[in-house]
């Protein structure tokens, strides 16, 4: 099963190939995608992305996880989250969201089992 390509990104809107949903923030993994609802884990810009935010994607068996910090990189990624991913043997890439989408799509094209969590506003 391959990871779906991110078809488009603009402020507050993301489209994933194979999904009719327009996402504000989203999670993607081999074979699927869904809304990333920060309320599920109490996530805020700071301290930022928590292990609980990425756990679902990790459990899908990804080799690499790309984190999009927002268009202005307002979303933090604490070292505890990076350590959690590394402990699970996952290569992690933390980037500004436009760059993160480019990196994610390049990895998809290479056939990597890649997942991602992306914030499409600030």
Swiss-Prot record:
Function: May play a role in preadipocyte differentiation and adipogenesis.
Chief place where the protein resides: cytoplasm
Coiled coil segments of this chain: none
MTH138-like domain: region residues: 6-122
Gene: AAMDC
PANTHER family named among the record's database cross-references: MTH938 DOMAIN-CONTAINING PROTEIN
InterPro entries given in the database record: AAMDC (IPR034096), MTH938-like_sf (IPR036748), NDUFAF3/AAMDC (IPR007523)
Pfam families the record matches: DUF498
Record protein name field: Mth938 domain-containing protein
Family, similarity comment: Belongs to the AAMDC family.
Sorted UniProt keywords: Cytoplasm
Organism from which the protein derives: Homo sapiens
């Amino acid at each position: 099963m391959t990871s779906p390509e991110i078809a488009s990104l603009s402020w507050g809107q993301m489209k994933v190939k194979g999904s009719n949903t327009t996402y504000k923030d989203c999670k993607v993994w081999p074979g699927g995608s869904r809304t990333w609802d920060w309320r599920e884990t109490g996530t805020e810009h700071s301290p930022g992305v928590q292990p609980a935010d990425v756990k679902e994607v990790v459990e899908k068996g990804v080799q690499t996880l790309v984190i999009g910090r927002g268009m202005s990189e307002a979303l933090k990624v604490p070292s505890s989250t990076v350590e959690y991913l590394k402990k699970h043997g996952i290569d992690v890439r933390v980037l500004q969201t436009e760059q993160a989408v480019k990196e994610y799509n390049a990895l998809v094209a290479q056939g990597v089992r890649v997942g991602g969590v992306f914030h499409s506003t600030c």
